[in-house]
Regions:
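Solvent-exposed interaction patches of small proteins and small membrane subunits
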Residues: 1-117
Length: 117
């Protein structure tokens, strides 16, 4: 198995994207986010990467961590790629500010369980 396809590497990608987008929006209001093309695109790209990395994780692994909404995580990538015209800034803001920090906790636990936090 190539290193870039390993679950460990995919989890690191998810963790790093969550950290990056969280840092990018730290201290930003929803109104400022909505008005900032750059912040919206940073958030969308991070979600695409997170979604793709989650899609590549084995079901045997994700099944052990039902606290994360894996199907929704994978599904947001499809929306970002194929139904981008229907994006809702408020919903993306909620995902980035509420749900990604929760996912980060699950991902850190997964990394710890497989031997790398």
């Amino acid at each position: 198995m190539a290193a870039s396809r390993s679950p460990h590497i995919r989890l690191l990608h998810i963790r790093d994207e969550i950290n990056g987008v969280t840092d990018a929006i730290k201290g930003v209001s929803f109104e400022d986010y909505r008005e900032s093309y750059a912040l919206r695109r940073v958030s969308e790209r991070a979600l695409q990467i997170i979604s793709e990395a989650a899609r590549a994780l084995p079901v045997e692994l994700t099944g052990k961590y039902p606290a994360a909404p894996w199907n929704a995580i994978i599904g947001i990538g499809n929306i970002l790629r194929h139904e981008y015209q229907h994006l809702d800034d408020r919903r993306l803001w909620e995902i980035v500010t509420v749900h990604l920090p929760q996912l980060r906790g699950v991902v850190l636990q997964m990394l710890s369980d497989i031997g790398d936090a």
